[in-house]
């Protein structure tokens, strides 16, 4: 019993230390965002002596941050819906409907994981420029969905492999079409995979900088990650208070 108690205590200590390490940057970010600029420069790691909301008032006064947040939300929401729909349906077809090219199609998606994002930037920029879709939400949604599909399809195929084929066959025998079988039976069972795919890619898409920095130059189309560059001055001077407040929001 004593060994079990000691083990539990050690486990709790480790968990508390882990939480402290994870939460400290968030706490520090909030404290830094409510410090005056002079105090933040003089003592960045000290507790705020005269907390102020001036940094938050500053970022909301020009209205830019709200536009950035709306653009990021719009792009993230549309991308996640497309990713979940396309990967769930493709995974179902690959897993449960065997045909001649099933293996090659699955290998094609698997190969997509190995393609670096960076090598596609110039070709996509040229393509978008010719199609006149630079500085649009579509220019960010398309690559986000494309690069998210390989891993998402693999996750859905892995889950569908645990669903008995007899369940699908019995539904078809009872008169369900493949579409009805997927919508009414298979997809509801995959809610855990849906949550995993949606939460994982929503973080990546919301924080995306490389695509936004390449394809977006107009102020009205900027996302949150790209809009934070606005707080960097012409000579590299950074308004850290406003930047931290924007990140906290």
Please annotate each region the language model reported.
Residues 3-249:
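A structural signal for multi-pass alpha-helical bundles of membrane permease subunits
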């Amino acid at each position: 019993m004593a060994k079990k108690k000691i083990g539990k205590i050690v486990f709790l200590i480790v968990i508390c230390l882990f939480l402290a390490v994870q939460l400290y940057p968030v706490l520090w970010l909030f404290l830094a965002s409510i410090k005056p600029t002079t105090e933040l420069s003089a003592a960045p790691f000290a507790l705020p002596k005269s907390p102020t909301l001036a940094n938050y008032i500053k970022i909301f006064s020009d209205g830019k941050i709200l536009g950035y947040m709306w653009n990021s939300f719009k792009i993230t929401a549309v991308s996640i819906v497309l990713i979940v729909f396309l990967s769930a349906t493709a995974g179902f077809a690959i897993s449960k409907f065997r045909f001649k090219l099933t293996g090659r199609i699955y290998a094609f998606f698997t190969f997509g994981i190995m393609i670096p994002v960076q090598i596609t930037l110039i070709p996509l920029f040229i393509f978008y420029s010719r199609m006149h879709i630079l500085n649009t939400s579509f220019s960010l949604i398309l690559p986000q969905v494309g690069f998210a599909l390989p891993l998402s399809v693999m996750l859905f195929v892995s889950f569908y492999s645990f669903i008995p084929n007899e369940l699908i066959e019995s539904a078809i025998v009872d008169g369900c079409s493949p579409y009805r079988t997927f919508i009414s039976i298979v997809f509801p069972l995959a809610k855990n995979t849906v949550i995993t795919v949606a939460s994982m890619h929503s973080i990546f898409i919301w924080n995306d900088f490389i695509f936004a920095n390449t394809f977006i130059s107009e102020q009205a189309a900027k996302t949150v990650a790209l809009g934070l560059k606005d707080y960097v001055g012409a000579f590299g001077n950074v308004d850290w208070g406003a930047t931290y407040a924007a990140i906290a929001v």
